[in-house]
């Protein structure tokens, strides 16, 4: 079975979150269209994401060797094991769906902490001194979707100026070697339930075309 990794970044329950509501509809529809996939879910507000400490690394984005690992205390070793587990989980997936709100022109901090964990030398990227880093996740077909909710309606100009989250996620995915990337914006959720529902319904209409864009 192929694997879809569904990553959510919102403390709200699904029924109150526009990004998670659209995210659920998206993954359900994807699984309907692609029965050879199974889903694995990762809630970054419930999952422990290690804070990266210098003791965990022997060089940039490269975890410590065995000798250095054995000198760490038990808690530090557990943190290193968690980083490896998160990175392996990401690497094993075929399709990635990330659902997050726009916060401060970007996204909630847990997503950045997670990305810092999984961009790892020898696993998702190849980093050699004096050479340009290369992504390692071009080893098989992969695709990624970033589902983002925002209160404001994003015209082209406003999106370029304010929407840093989508551009960053696309860049980091391609940096790791994942070339197929699509965005699914749930913008204009506004301040009323009616506005939010309209934005969600509009996003629902785009789900099939986004799925076709990544797989």
Curated annotation (Swiss-Prot):
<keyword id="KW-0560">Oxidoreductase</keyword>
<dbReference type="InterPro" id="IPR023048">
    <property type="entry name" value="NADH:quinone_OxRdtase_FMN_depd"/>
</dbReference>
<dbReference type="InterPro" id="IPR003680">
    <property type="entry name" value="Flavodoxin_fold"/>
</dbReference>
<comment type="function">
    <text>Also exhibits azoreductase activity. Catalyzes the reductive cleavage of the azo bond in aromatic azo compounds to the corresponding amines.</text>
</comment>
<comment type="similarity">
    <text>Belongs to the azoreductase type 1 family.</text>
</comment>
<dbReference type="InterPro" id="IPR029039">
    <property type="entry name" value="Flavoprotein-like_sf"/>
</dbReference>
<feature type="binding site">
    <location>
        <begin position="17"/>
        <end position="19"/>
    </location>
    <ligand>
        <name>FMN</name>
    </ligand>
</feature>
<dbReference type="GO" id="GO:0009055">
    <property type="term" value="F:electron transfer activity"/>
</dbReference>
<comment type="subunit">
    <text>Homodimer.</text>
</comment>
<comment type="function">
    <text>Quinone reductase that provides resistance to thiol-specific stress caused by electrophilic quinones.</text>
</comment>
<dbReference type="GO" id="GO:0010181">
    <property type="term" value="F:FMN binding"/>
</dbReference>
<dbReference type="Pfam" id="PF02525">
    <property type="entry name" value="Flavodoxin_2"/>
</dbReference>
<protein>
    <recommendedName>
        <fullName>FMN-dependent NADH:quinone oxidoreductase</fullName>
        <ecNumber>1.6.5.-</ecNumber>
        <ecNumber>1.7.1.17</ecNumber>
    </recommendedName>
</protein>
<keyword id="KW-0288">FMN</keyword>
<keyword id="KW-0520">NAD</keyword>
<keyword id="KW-0285">Flavoprotein</keyword>
<dbReference type="GO" id="GO:0016655">
    <property type="term" value="F:oxidoreductase activity, acting on NAD(P)H, quinone or similar compound as acceptor"/>
</dbReference>
<dbReference type="InterPro" id="IPR050104">
    <property type="entry name" value="FMN-dep_NADH:Q_OxRdtase_AzoR1"/>
</dbReference>
<dbReference type="GO" id="GO:0016652">
    <property type="term" value="F:oxidoreductase activity, acting on NAD(P)H as acceptor"/>
</dbReference>
